């Protein structure tokens, strides 16, 4: 098994050759380590990445044989968003995946992350075409500012919409594209401090925790609307999403 950090789908901003090849090269950077672990060797393009960062790979005797003998048997990855490669924009990698130019065709979260369920289907197909191994989505979710109503309920329909759309995209990848998907786990079950921004206000969970960004609060836990929705999704094995 190989688990990589969050992986974004990458689209070229235009059909300009520099955007197209730039997106391609940006993608290869993201997939370098999985290429090694699934193909059992360092790809030809790895040296150009090493040169870019001034890195010298030291291989011990027998390392190449070990890589070749023990390839990974499935790929686990996190998916939150897609990005656009624009030759005129900065393109970076963060805890949430690859990040580039904004996509005018997609809505975003309060933190500017594109919401793209179809992008997950795209990535599933891309990875299976590349590795021909089963896939496992181990993180998928949206950070949002949740509001507690006077009666204590949290109506996070936006989170339900996000998860529903992505689960439907997985179903299409399985049923229409015949991609073997082993499983899916959302991020996350309970609110915790965001690893990306250090904020408690950026909530991913289906269970609300009464704590603010300064650590103040009762720590009381409350089930959000998404909790009951996902409970039903589990009971029906994903057959009933509405």
Where are these regions (language model features)?
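Active-site region of glycoside hydrolase catalytic domains
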Residues: 3-242
């Amino acid at each position: 098994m190989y688990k990589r950090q969050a992986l974004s789908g990458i689209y070229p901003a235009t059909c300009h050759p520099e955007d197209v090849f730039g997106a391609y090269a940006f993608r290869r950077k993201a997939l370098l380590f999985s290429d090694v672990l699934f193909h059992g060797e360092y790809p030809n393009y790895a040296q150009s990445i090493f040169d870019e960062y001034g890195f010298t790979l030291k291989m011990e005797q027998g390392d190449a044989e070990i890589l070749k003998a023990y390839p990974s048997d499935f790929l686990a990855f996190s998916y939150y968003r897609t990005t656009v490669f624009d030759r005129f924009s900065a393109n970076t990698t963060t805890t949430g995946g690859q990040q580039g130019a904004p996509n005018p065709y997609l809505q975003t979260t309060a933190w500017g992350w594109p919401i793209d369920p179809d992008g997950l289907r795209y990535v599933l197909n891309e990875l299976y075409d590349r590795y021909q191994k089963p896939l496992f989505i181990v993180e998928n979710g949206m950070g949002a500012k949740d509001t507690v109503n006077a009666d204590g309920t949290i109506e996070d329909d936006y989170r339900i919409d996000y998860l529903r759309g992505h689960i439907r995209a997985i179903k299409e990848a399985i049923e229409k594209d015949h991609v073997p998907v082993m499983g899916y786990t959302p991020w996350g079950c309970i609110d915790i401090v965001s690893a990306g921004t250090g904020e408690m206000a950026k909530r991913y969970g289906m269970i609300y925790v009464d704590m603010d960004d300064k650590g103040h609060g009762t720590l009381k836990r409350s089930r959000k609307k998404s909790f009951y929705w996902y409970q039903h999704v589990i009971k029906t094995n994903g057959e009933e999403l509405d």
